[in-house]
């Protein structure tokens, strides 16, 4: 019996895959537990539509990530912060990824999720810092952050 897997089944198939499995296994285990459904013409058409929608959503998300990368990679895109600092250029406080995201949105209107920024520890010194951002699978950018001393 041909079935369409609705979930990953270890050793049998992945979600969205169409496979031929024994009738008893399909009816008594896979279909009963909702792990698969019978591969009828209607279900096959539904599968094709769902795959097309998922691919379109993936392409749209990747295009959006490419657009954001182009904005971030421009020479004039530098996130500016003013902060109080001591004599040794150490900040009183720090600049976290949350503040960087807020600065990007406020200064340039670019929305980026803070979890996409690779900032191992908050910025605690004056000057320029490059922060890497993984926007999408295979799409990475660098956010330039400039921290100056507040008067």
UniProtKB/Swiss-Prot annotation:
UniProt xrefs under PROSITE patterns: RIBOSOMAL_L9
Keyword flag rRNA-binding: yes
Record key words, sorted: Ribonucleoprotein, Ribosomal protein, RNA-binding, rRNA-binding
GO cellular component: ribonucleoprotein complex; ribosome
Ribosomal protein is among the record's keywords: yes
GO molecular function, one term: rRNA binding
One GO term (biological process): translation
Domain of life from the UniProt record: Bacteria
Pfam families referenced in this protein's UniProt entry, alphabetically: Ribosomal_L9_C (PF03948), Ribosomal_L9_N (PF01281)
Family assignment from sequence similarity: Belongs to the bacterial ribosomal protein bL9 family.
Role: Binds to the 23S rRNA.
Name of the protein in its database record: Large ribosomal subunit protein bL9
Gene name, Swiss-Prot/TrEMBL: rplI
């Amino acid at each position: 019996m041909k079935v369409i897997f609705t979930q990953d089944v270890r050793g049998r198939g992945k979600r969205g895959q169409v496979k031929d499995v024994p009738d008893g296994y399909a009816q008594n285990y896979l279909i009963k537990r909702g792990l698969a459904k019978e591969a009828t013409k209607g279900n096959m058409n539904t599968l094709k539509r769902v795959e097309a929608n998922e691919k379109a959503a993936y392409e749209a998300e990747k295009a959006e990530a490419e657009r954001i990368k182009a904005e971030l990679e421009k020479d004039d895109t530098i996130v500016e912060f003013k902060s109080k600092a001591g004599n040794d250029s150490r900040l009183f406080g720090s600049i976290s990824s949350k503040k960087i995201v807020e600065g990007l949105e406020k200064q340039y209107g670019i929305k980026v999720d803070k979890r996409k920024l690779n900032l191992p520890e908050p910025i605690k010194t004056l000057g320029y810092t490059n922060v890497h951002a993984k926007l999408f699978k295979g799409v990475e950018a660098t956010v330039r952050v400039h921290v100056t001393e507040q008067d």
